[in-house]
Amino acid sequence: MYFKRYLQLAKPGIIFGNLITLTGGFLLATHREIGFEYLPLFVYVMIGVALMIAAGCVFNNIYDKDIDSSMTRTQNRPLVTGDISVIQATIYGTILLILSCLVLYYLVILLTLWIIIIGFIVYVGIYTVSKRLTIHATVLGGISGAIPPVAGYTAVVNILDYNALALFLILFFWQIPHSYAIAMLYIDDYKKVKLPMLPIVKGIAYTKKIMLFYLALFVVSCALPAVLGSADLFSFIVCMLVALFWMYKSIQSYRTDTDRVFAKTVFKFSIIVITVICLTMG
């Protein structure tokens, strides 16, 4: 029972999603090969990054305890129900953070460790705090969310180059419509706790247009790995097809569906699209 509650505190769904994007960066660097040569490194970087993301989620839960208790979708989180105390969560998060640093420092490379630490700082120190203050918090959070594929890539090549930037942009532009779709779906919860989310402050109509704008940027960014010569023709075709398909379905829903159906459409296909792109990268 306690294991389940501690696992819930680390938000395994977020960890899993980020590890998929990390895999995309790793595959781009190895040209879709994870044989015996790269398998140990792949396992180590996955573990190290997973621990850091888990630590970030734990500290996010600690800071958000007060607003989580007022929102329907978060009111059963362990800190809200009292199954785990703030002190226990702080110790847990600190242990995860230390373990992550040890794994990445000793078993991966220092560059990847620093990149992941930056992502942690942005998520916990900037995004978590700023989402109570500004409508731009989602964009700031997009920075931390775009870090895992860069970490996966640098773990192999040990350098920050244009390919790393391309991976960052793909995930950054993907995250904005994905996150705003969630904001639209749970807008009533966010209104309860007075969070200045874009759909609340600027309205649904404006938010939908912004989502399509970032979606268009995402489609363009998907061509970058091939343009830079790091991705092959197969990867380029798959990436562009699924990105354009997401764009098409979103525009179609924008024109014909209700706001909620539009948000569900964007969210549903965002998961499918990023998974396919990351697993065929290389």
Swiss-Prot record:
Keyword Transport carried by entry: no
Topological relation to the membrane, as annotated: Multi-pass membrane protein
Enzyme class: transferase
Keywords: Cell inner membrane, Cell membrane, Heme biosynthesis, Membrane, Transferase, Transmembrane, Transmembrane helix
EC number: 2.5.1.141
NCBIfam families noted in UniProt: cyoE_ctaB (TIGR01473), PRK04375.1-1 (NF003348)
Name of the protein in question: Protoheme IX farnesyltransferase
Species: Francisella tularensis subsp. tularensis (strain SCHU S4 / Schu 4)
